[in-house]
Amino acid sequence: MPEVSSDIDSFKVVINPEGIVGQTIKVNRSLFEVILLSDKSHKIPIQNENKFFCEASGLGIPKKIFCDVDLTLGDKDFELKQKIYSSGLGGIFPKGIEIGSIYEIQDLTPKEVRIIIDLNADPLTSNYFGVLL
């Protein structure tokens, strides 16, 4: 059985050919436990090209994450189909990796909206994954 590098531990980025899928949360010998971006308990700091930042949470639906945005905190510049990137804040995910695009904008209250983001990477379309060290 191949030996796993000691450099690989929890909180490493997991990718497939389409992009970021999630991150490692546990490594045991040659097995990696991965939490997907779309998992309800996962969060990832994101941004768009207009410097809108948000901490997105998994929606619990395949390939979907969301941000709840308080519209009273200033101008928010986002729109449907706009590309979303990893912000690099938090130190786990590299800055500037395209992770998806805005799929839907839902009004929660007159002062708050929910942005639904459709992720680029689908973990079900690949049998091969990489771990960024």
Where are these regions (language model features)?
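A secondary-structure micro-motif
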Residues: 1-133
